[in-house]
Amino acid sequence: MHQTEAFAAGEEAEELRPSVESDKKEERILARRLRLAARKEAQTKQRLGEDDLGKEDVKEETRKSQKEVEHRERRMAKLKSDGLELVTNIQVAADARESDRRTELEEGHRLRREKLENEAKSSQEKFEEINRKWTDAKMKQTPLDLRDALSSQQQLCEQIIADKNKLISELQQELKASDDRYVKDLKRQAKDIDLLVERMEEQISTLKKSYREDLHQIENSLDEERRTLLTKHKKKWEHERKDRNEKELKNMMQSLSVMEEYADLLQKLRVQTAEEYNIDKIRMDTEVQKLRMKVQQTKFNCHMNEEKLDYKYEVLKKKEEENAIIKSQLKRKIIRMQDVLNNLKSKLTKQEKQSKAGNQSLSNDYTRISQQYKDMQKKARHFAALDAERLEKLWLMCEDEAKALTHRALETDRVIHEQQLGLEWASPPLPFMERSGAVQQKTFRTATQAAADTLKGEPEGGLDEDTAAGLNKRTVKSILELLCDEMGFLVESKLLMLLSPLEKNEQSLIKLDAIFSAIGIESEKDVYKMAEFFMNYRQHESKYTKDETANGQGESAEELSNLIHTEDLLAALKDFTAQFCRQDVHASHKSSILGLDMRDDSEDAAYWESIANVMPESKLKLWDALDTALNKYHAVLTERTELLMETQNIQQQNSELRQLLHLYTTSKAQ
């Protein structure tokens, strides 16, 4: 009866949308929940890009399925509230009875305490009276008086015992009444529990039935909405496709019109160029006429200069006579200077002897330092080989670990696609799986090695070949020799003293090494870049054509000076170092001096990046979305498991309570 009334009230409340401004607490809570659910759904759609309509106005009317879900949620909330009220009514009544029972029990305790206190007082008074009479009885001497006193004392004791027995009987009656009342309470509680279980089972069956109906209605509304959305999106797609076709046709027509405009513009430019050529020709003819007039003026100036020279010749004759006098004076001065010269020659002889001794000492030092340098090169190569071997081992270990992780990630992706999503899985391209070991190292020749090979080349055949940069070796050799001759100030004076006993090629090689160290040239590529820069420098300054530069590459050093003049060499070198050479070249120059191979690690980052990015960003987003959905599903399953276990425990407790109650009532009845 109560359940039917609650269901009817719920049907009436379903027509009203809950509001946060409602007077009822349940409706306000439900309205907040619905608003939070709608907000979370909108955020999820915006993050995953599932629905472009998520960016529309917030006041947009909710979908039909959402309305159906909200309607069913309000109905179920009302049904749960009514069912909970029916179940808790029994508990409220039991609590009220228990409160009354405890009140009566406290009142009975109070009355019993008062009775016990009154009886204790009266018993104490009677006991004191008995003690006083014993004192009086001891003072009596006749047996008759003693018998009367003893009888009186006996009556008083019997009266005390009678009062005690009366109190005990009253307490026993109350105890029996409490036992009877306890049995009645147990029976009443058993009836309440049965009624409670019956109402709970009835409520559970009603909720199950309502849940099934709501689920069926929600599924129907979702199917209908899905069909509507499919139809809507199909129409939208057709409309977009038509618009795209129209835009492509429009763009094609615009391209044709632009091509026609460009053709007209090209014809106009041709006509304009022809007109400019005619204007330039007229201007050049005018300049030629001006130059001819200038030549005539120059001839006139030459004639005037001849007359001036004749005048100066007469003046010089007079000066010659004066110079004869001065010459005689200078002869006397020369004699004095010869004496000074002889003294200086003797000093020079002594200085040469000292210089030879110093050179011999420096030569010995150079031999010793050269041997130390070779030993250091040998050790450096040894350690470089060890480092390369360690790098290869570490590379292979990291590569194996990365490939294992890649296989694991691909297997996980395959399981997700095939088992969780039901899609066909295709393996992405894995070019790094087909290779093993470090990225191939590139060995660069140092600038000193390239200079040594160039300077030692034979002119018959080796110098006529082209380098890897497309330059002629003869030209490169000429540039290096020009550097040795003109850039000697970059070499230390002590080093120049050590180079005097060496051959010319060795001197040039050591000078070039010092010059390269000073300007920051490290590799063979830098040498060829410098040579090309020098060849183009004079061309850039004098606006020579590239054909003249190409014809001059195979000529001698004298012809090279026409391309880069010795006076321009220092300026060209400054420009080259400012544009191409780095400021901090100490570390790389040290490795070039030791003769170590320089490893190109430019492709290492791309190689490891390709392994790290084997999974595209789209798949990672798919994994995150799937992980979130599975976590929610797991949370729902966990909650259902806990509820089932709790229900089973409650059922087991109810059955145990029924058995205990049945045993207790049976034992009381017996």
From Swiss-Prot:
An example Gene Ontology biological process: axonemal dynein complex assembly
Compositional bias segments (type: Basic and acidic residues): 15-26
Transmembrane segments: none
Region (Disordered): 1-26, 39-72
Compartment(s): Cytoplasm, Cytoskeleton, Cilium axoneme; Cytoplasm, Cytoskeleton, Flagellum axoneme
GO terms under cellular component: axonemal dynein complex; axoneme; motile cilium
Keywords, in A-Z order: Cell projection, Cilium, Coiled coil, Cytoplasm, Cytoskeleton, Flagellum
Keyword check for Oxidoreductase: no
Parts forming coiled coils: 55-261, 326-382
Compositionally biased intervals (Low complexity): 1-10
Role this protein plays: Component of the nexin-dynein regulatory complex (N-DRC) a key regulator of ciliary/flagellar motility which maintains the alignment and integrity of the distal axoneme and regulates microtubule sliding in motile axonemes. Plays a critical role in the assembly of N-DRC and also stabilizes the assembly of multiple inner dynein arms and radial spokes. Coassembles with CCDC65/DRC2 to form a central scaffold needed for assembly of the N-DRC and its attachment to the outer doublet microtubules.
Subunit-structure text: Component of the nexin-dynein regulatory complex (N-DRC).
PANTHER family: DYNEIN REGULATORY COMPLEX PROTEIN 1, NYD-SP28 PROTEIN
Family indicated by similarity: Belongs to the DRC1 family.
The protein, known as: Dynein regulatory complex protein 1
